[in-house]
Amino acid sequence: LKGHFLLISTAKTYIEIPFRYRLAGKLKLHKFLPSSFLRKPQWITYYLFGVVTRDARKLLREILRDTDLQFSQWAINQILNWKNLNLPESYIHVHGTEDRLLPNGNAQIYIEEAGHLMILTHSSQINKIIDDFLLSVNSSSKQ
């Protein structure tokens, strides 16, 4: 694993943000999203985040409950209106095959049957990738 940036469950450029999100940003549709949608997960929330187990659903409920509402609204606005076209010079991109929140077909490493919360639901696989990444960065910096 050679690279200087480790990107997990994300998009590298705005082109990887689904068109429907970019369109929603242009039309400012997210401004009409009720705050209850950001606080209390609905079936669509579970679907988008790819959580299927009872424990994962409980964890997502806790995360949403504990997340600052203003931060959530700010973050959604930033994602929907992001215009980055610059790729990092050197990176490793890790993505879940079942990530419906940010579906992506341009990663170098895919975690099978993993959704957007794969750092929690597939933590042993992600930890191994992080360990390998840190070892490669450390060994390349010594050369």
Regions found by a protein language model. Give the residues of each.
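Conserved alpha/beta-hydrolase catalytic His-Asp/Glu region
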Residues: 37-84
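Catalytic histidine-centered segment of alpha/beta-hydrolase-like enzymes
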Residues: 114-129
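Short glycine-/acidic-enriched loop or helix-start segments at secondary-structure transitions
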Residues: 1, 16-17, 102-105
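Short beta-strand/loop motif that positions the catalytic acidic residue
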Residues: 93-95, 99
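C-terminal alpha-helix
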Residues: 129-140
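Flexible "cap/lid" loop of the alpha/beta hydrolase fold
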Residues: 3-36
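Active-site loop signature of alpha/beta-hydrolase-fold enzymes
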Residues: 13, 100, 117
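Short, proline-enriched alpha-helix->beta-strand connector loops that line the catalytic pocket
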Residues: 87-91, 103-107
